[in-house]
């Protein structure tokens, strides 16, 4: 049983010096204690069954990366789920190489997600301004958004507050300050470069349908409703890439829509739901098929294949099938460029 109990007051009155107002009585899981680098290495060797061939190298890596990011982030791949120890033969170097592989994956995906982000920024600013004009008061006007439903109203109010923050006071962006100072106005095409992918995606989702349709027509075989779902997922993955979180096993609570590529790749289904390519890393690979032009997409897939092949050729601590399973990739994922989008 866990109970909150107030400490006894000293006879002289007042609260106990240096004590919390309440303490926990009963059986609890104690917070993990601090370990120095040598203790961390000993724990990995003796308690976690991890081979460490070069302790000096291991210590240097832990200084650069941190125990939590490296071991906490990548332990599940090579651990026995029953014993909570690493599988026999797993080395510290195996964990480090997996960490570096994921880092390279983040860099690759982020580079192409930024291309999508820039395209959405360009198109949203173009079609919004085409309809409403270049004065900043237009994108600060709630009537220029789809102001139906309480949720939309709250989201629009929050978005406009963000936009106002850029144009009503000095910012760190010289081009915004220059436009405001010289012209007394910051057109949307100037502002969008400072906005995050999340900001511009939210703006797209809150725009009237006619503007959404015009934007979506720049992407083959994707309608405005599908675009909303795709952008929601891509924003989440972009943030994972940008913030250095573990990417290759990441799953979102949101999903991209069922697209023709799912069917053409004959992705397995559980009931009516596709097993892969909905909220995992492969969902991004599929979404990029529709959101990038053909040249960029071919370059992306070429780089992705090379990165995966290099890792698998160099390391046998995880099989190709295991890696694909963790990433949400079907075995025939390499065929994705053979199929038309529709």
Across the structure, where does each feature detected by a protein language model lie?
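Acidic/aromatic/glycine-rich contiguous surface patches that form carbohydrate-binding/processing clefts
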Residues: 244
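Extended intrinsically disordered or low-complexity regions, especially N/C-terminal cytosolic tails and loops
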Residues: 1-236, 248-342
């Amino acid at each position: 049983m866990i109970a909150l109990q107030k400490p006894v007051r000293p006879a002289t009155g007042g609260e106990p010096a240096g004590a919390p107002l309440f303490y926990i009585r009963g059986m609890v899981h104690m917070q993990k204690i601090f370990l120095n680098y040598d203790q961390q290495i000993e724990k990995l060797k003796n308690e976690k069954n991890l081979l460490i061939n070069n302790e000096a190298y291991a210590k240097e890596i832990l200084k650069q990366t941190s125990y939590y990011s490296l071991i906490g982030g990548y332990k599940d791949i090579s651990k026995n789920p029953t014993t909570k120890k690493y599988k026999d033969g797993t080395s510290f170097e195996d964990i480090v190489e997996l960490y570096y592989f994921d880092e390279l994956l983040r860099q690759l995906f982020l580079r192409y997600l930024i291309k999508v982000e820039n395209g959405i920024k360009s198109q949203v600013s173009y079609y919004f301004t085409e309809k409403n004009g270049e004065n900043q008061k237009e994108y600060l006007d709630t009537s220029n958004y789809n102001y139906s439903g309480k949720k939309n109203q709250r989201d629009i109010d929050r978005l406009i507050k963000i936009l106002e923050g850029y144009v009503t006071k000095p910012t760190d962006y010289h081009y915004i300050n220059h436009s405001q100072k010289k012209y007394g106005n910051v057109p949307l095409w100037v502002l969008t470069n400072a906005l995050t992918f999340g900001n511009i995606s939210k703006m797209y989702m809150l725009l009237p349908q006619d503007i959404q349709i015009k934007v979506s027509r720049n992407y083959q075989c994707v309608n405005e409703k599908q675009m909303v779902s795709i952008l929601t997922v891509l924003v989440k993955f972009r943030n994972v890439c940008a913030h250095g979180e573990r990417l290759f096993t990441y799953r979102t609570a949101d999903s991209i829509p069922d697209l023709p590529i799912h069917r053409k790749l004959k992705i397995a289904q559980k009931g009516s739901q596709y097993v892969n390519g909905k909220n995992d890393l492969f969902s991004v690979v599929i979404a990029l098929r529709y959101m990038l032009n053909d040249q960029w997409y071919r370059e992306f897939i070429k780089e992705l294949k090379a990165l995966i092949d290099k890792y698998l050729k160099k390391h046998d601590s995880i099989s190709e099938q295991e890696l694909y399973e963790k990433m949400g990739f079907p075995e025939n994922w390499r065929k994705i460029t053979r199929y038309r989008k529709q």
